[in-house]
Amino acid sequence: MAIKDLTATTGDSSLPLIKSPPSETTGGDRTSALQTLGNIIVSIVGTGVLGLPYAFRIAGWLAGSLGVIIVGFATYYCMLLLIQCRDKLESEEGEEESKTYGDLGFKCMGTKGRYLTEFLIFTAQCGGSVAYLVFIGRNLSSIFSSYGLSMVSFILILVPIEVGLSWITSLSALSPFSIFADICNIIAMCFVVKENVEMVIEGDFSFSDRTAISSTIGGLPFAGGVAVFCFEGFAMTLALESSMREREAFPKLLAKVLAGITFVYVLFGFCGYMAYGDQTKDIITLNLPNNWSAIAVQIGLCVGLTFTFPIMVHPLNEIIEQKLKRIDWLQKHHNGYSNETGSVSKFAIFTTRTLLVVGLAAIASLVPGFGTFASLVGSTLCALISFVLPASYHLTLLGPSLNVWNKSIDVFIVICGLIFAVYGTYNTIVGV
């Protein structure tokens, strides 16, 4: 959950985190290849990419580049595993309605499997939401450093704003801000690349001063965690594939998009580290020069993300409110209220949404650094969602029909994913 918006739009409709994607029969709502391409990019690429140069600083430019490439390829492979699992499940049960990630967990491990899958996705989405707040707080505290306000101060200032925005039930009014934030994100990346080019032209740069492979072994899993965090978008894989008009073309389209994203990630991480070397900060925008154009980009990012935050937490609200509908006490005392959330009262909705924002803000205020937090989420939640679960489900559902080579790959991915999750978590907690 990079900083990632794990909702993708198809026309005016939203494809939420765990909610079932469009049915096979609703062909009129399907997306074109171009629309699907855009949805894939929105689902994967977020402001987490602005932490990649710092990961390259920790691991070294060569190790960082290879790590991003490996993660990009593994992401593509495991996304295809998910699709194969879903297709197998649909063919066995003969149902036209597309299955979700949680359905795969239920088929493989029963109710516990569904709860595990949805819990990991829910927690990862919380992690991405916390990262939004940390990113905004760090940038604003840097811009207004002369006022003596810390990151925590700005996060507290954001709380009432985000609470009010979270009460908006329709997200259509906020969707332009998501696009605005993405534009600012791209501009910030261009600024960093421009800085690097200018430093090379002016001679204020020495390639030999940049580390290729870190001598500290802990730097490699740290950078790997950040890379996994930047690629995480598995919660949307099945929904995006199901929503495409020509579903058979999805794997090829996904390969092209992920290849392009991987190239941009490597280029940006490399250029960012080359530009600032050991001075590279965990959010690269903090390295930008203190001029009006750089400050405008930072403020633009913060404004865009402030209004995008409700979109980020929307799937969380949906999950919580779906659970509330099953509580007998609420159904008994608020059965007079009926809308899209059923018998859940407005008071319950506003209360839970307020508590969610306050809780996420409290966690964000305790985060020691953006890079450390991104690596922690990537090493734990995202690694399990992206690699361990898809390979495990693939082995369970299609195991009898797989050859020895494919089974070996699945087992290898599961083992490597678990080792990476355990060691990466330990390494991030104790510090690089």
UniProtKB/Swiss-Prot annotation:
Give the UniProt entry's GO cellular component terms. Answer: endoplasmic reticulum membrane; membrane
Q: What is the name listed in the Swiss-Prot or TrEMBL entry for this protein? A: Amino acid transporter ANT1
Intracellular or extracellular location(s):
Endoplasmic reticulum membrane
Lineage of the source organism?
A: Eukaryota, Viridiplantae, Streptophyta, Embryophyta, Tracheophyta
The topology of this chain with respect to the membrane is: Multi-pass membrane protein
A Gene Ontology biological process in which this protein takes part is: response to nematode
Classification via InterPro entries: AA_transpt_TM
Disulfide topology: none
Where are the annotated segments for Disordered? Answer: 1-30
Q: Which family does it belong to?
A: Belongs to the amino acid/polyamine transporter 2 family. Amino acid/auxin permease (AAAP) (TC 2.A.18.8) subfamily.
Q: What tissues express this gene product? A: Ubiquitous. Highly expressed in flowers and cauline leaves and at lower levels in stems, leaves and roots.
Q: Which UniProt keywords apply?
A: Amino-acid transport, Endoplasmic reticulum, Membrane, Transmembrane, Transmembrane helix, Transport
Show the stretches that span the lipid bilayer. 36-56, 63-83, 116-136, 148-168, 173-193, 220-240, 257-277, 293-313, 354-374, 380-400, 411-431
Q: Name one GO molecular function term.
A: neutral L-amino acid transmembrane transporter activity
Say yes or no: keyword Chloroplast present: no
Q: What is this protein's function per UniProt? A: Translocates aromatic and neutral amino acids such as tyrosine, tryptophan, phenylalanine, histidine, proline, leucine, valine, glutamine, as well as arginine. Transports the auxins indole-3-acetic acid (IAA) and 2,4-dichlorophenoxyacetic acid (2,4-D).
Give the source species. Arabidopsis thaliana (Mouse-ear cress)
Q: Which residues lie on this side of the membrane: Lumenal?
A: 57-62, 137-147, 194-219, 278-292, 375-379, 432
Cytoplasmic topological domain ranges are: 1-35, 84-115, 169-172, 241-256, 314-353, 401-410
